[in-house]
Amino acid sequence: APYKQKVGVLPGPVFHLPFPSRDNGVTCGEALKAMDRLFSVEIDVNDVACFIIEPVQGEGGFLTLDVEFAQALRRFCDEKSILLIADEIQSGFGRTGQRFAFSRLGIEPDLILLGKSIAGGVPLGAVVGRKSLLDNLPKGGLGGTYSGNPIACAAALATLDEMTDEHLNVWGAQQEEAIVSRYESWRSKKLSPYLGRLTGVGAMRGIELANADGSPAPQQLTQLLALARDAGLLLMPSGKSRHIIRLLAPLTIEAAVLEEGLDILEGCLVKLGQVSH
C-alpha cells in the first residue's frame, strides 16, 4: 500500500490475497478461504490471467511463503489453466540458500521474474519461462527502448559464470550463520526491549521491532535508522507497518565487513533502548 500512494490510476483489475507465512501468523487455511471468497464475490475464476507470488516477500518484511499454500496454489492454477508467476527479483540467485527461492516450496512456476543480482549491480531485468509460453511471442514483440543493452548483458553473463551453485550455497550459508547467531545472542542478552522476531530465510533476513505487547514499533524503527545512519550504517525499513529492518548484504561481502555492520547495528539497538525509555 505505501508504494501506491501518489502513483495515480493503476492498471486493473488486480486483486490481492493474504500472504500466509510463519512470520505473520496468517495460515494456509485462512489464505485459501480468502481465495474462495474472492472467486465467489469479486471475480470469475475464468477471467483470471495469472497469480503472482513472492516466495519471500521483499517490501513486505522478508516473510516466507507457506509451503502448503504454494503447492495448493500450483494445483489450483493447473486445474484452471492459470499461469503462476514467481517474482524472484529480490530473492533470486542464492539469497535464500538456493539459486531460486521457489525451490524450497516444491513448485515450478510458469514464469520467473529476475533482476537485481542477475547482473551484479548493472541494471538488468529478465523474464524466464516455459518454452511453450515464450515461443508464442513474435521475435521482437516484447521489448523496450533499453532492452538487450549489450553492456548489461555482458555483465549478466560474467555474473552468472561466477554464480555456481557451490559459490551461492557457501556465500548464503556463511551470511545466514553470522546473522542468526548474532540475533540469537541479542535475544539471550535481552539487548533491546524492542527486538522482535527474525524473519526470512538464508541470507535474506529481517529484524522486527516490536513493543512489549508484540505490536509493531515503526517509530522506534525510524529512530534506529537515524542512529545507524549517524554511525555509518545505512538500513532500510520494510513490512506493512514499516517496522522490520532489511538485512540484504551482497552475497560476496567479506565476513569482517558483515560483522562490522552487525556490530554497528548492535550498538544502535542498545542506544535505542536507552533513548526510547
Language-model segments: residues:
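Conserved N-terminal phosphate-binding loop of PLP-dependent enzymes in the Aspartate aminotransferase
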Residues: 1-277
